[in-house]
Amino acid sequence: MKYAFFLGCIMPNRYAGVESATRTVMEKLGVELVDMPGASCCPAPGVFGSFDQKTWLTLAARNLVIAEEMGTDIVTVCNGCYGSLYEAAHMLHENKEALAMVNEQLKEIGKEYKGTVHVRHFAELIYKEIGVDKIRENVVKPLAVNIGVHYGCHFLKPTAAKGLGNAEHPTMLDELVEATGAKSVDYKDKMMCCGAGGGVRAKELDLALSMTQEKIENMLAVGADATVNVCPFCQLQFDRGQVEIKEKLGNEYNFPVVHLSQLLGLAMGMDPKEVALDVNFISPEPLLQKLGY
């Protein structure tokens, strides 16, 4: 299997360990990730798409064209990038007027979107194409810890377009986490936003942090040792957000934050430094001690 690897903005700039872990995990699972030359921001669906749909759709289509020219589908590890690119491809497939408008814009740079590319999320690809059993087979260090899974907003919704199962009671990420030997613990308001999305973090930071704090407290209440996400923006909100919660709200949690690719990397025998857990704002030490590092 070969995929065009869409990096997005936050992962290469803030969480390079997520990229490193993703590349290593995918290589071990037999998936070749190919860089996309000239790829731009997805762009963010909750910001660009809300204020200027034409610009959002054209920029997203330009990224899709890069993958088309490479002759392969796209995979990303970011919910926002997945939401933006997937929804753009879906809209261009369903709306011929939108397709004509976009191609009129792309003509100015000598490009045309043909609609041949599919957009996959890293977690969806692993779950559907590789399978939970294959993950279990590759585990060399079972992770005997409790994990609070955070799905995020753009991974599953809009449900009708993505078709990844029940958006209110999903199991996909829980199954992948438990394939590592960890236990996925259920907690109150599991499907609530991390607090960062839709421009909330940028415009109403206090509100965003109160949502993050509520989710962390709900996970801690059921004995979670860490939270696992599938989006660098969610990772930023839980990780950097804890520093801001301490500064603004006076509460300190030191609750480890891990991307799914990093968790899979640990289970497959990668060192914590290989997946760059040591460069998070929040120390992973409480989690690593429980794992015997």
Curated annotation (Swiss-Prot):
It catalyses: coenzyme B + coenzyme M + 2 reduced [2Fe-2S]-[ferredoxin] + 2 H(+) = coenzyme M-coenzyme B heterodisulfide + 2 H2 + 2 oxidized [2Fe-2S]-[ferredoxin]; coenzyme B + coenzyme M + 2 reduced [2Fe-2S]-[ferredoxin] + 2 CO2 = coenzyme M-coenzyme B heterodisulfide + 2 formate + 2 oxidized [2Fe-2S]-[ferredoxin]. Its EC number is 1.8.98.5, 1.8.98.6. The gene is hdrB2. Pathway: Cofactor metabolism; coenzyme M-coenzyme B heterodisulfide reduction; coenzyme B and coenzyme M from coenzyme M-coenzyme B heterodisulfide: step 1/1. Belongs to the HdrB family. This is H(2)/formate:CoB-CoM heterodisulfide,ferredoxin reductase subunit B2. GO terms for molecular function: CoB--CoM heterodisulfide reductase activity. The keyword Oxidoreductase applies. The heterodisulfide reductase is composed of three subunits; HdrA, HdrB and HdrC. B1 and B2 subunits are interchangeable, as are the C1 and C2 subunits. The heterodisulfide reductase forms a supercomplex with formylmethanofuran dehydrogenase (Fwd), F(420)-non-reducing hydrogenase (Vhu) and formate dehydrogenase (Fdh). GO terms for biological process: methanogenesis. Part of a complex that catalyzes the reversible reduction of CoM-S-S-CoB to the thiol-coenzymes H-S-CoM (coenzyme M) and H-S-CoB (coenzyme B). PANTHER family: COB--COM HETERODISULFIDE REDUCTASE SUBUNIT B 1. Disulfide bonds: none annotated. It comes from Methanococcus maripaludis (strain DSM 14266 / JCM 13030 / NBRC 101832 / S2 / LL). Keywords: Methanogenesis, Oxidoreductase.
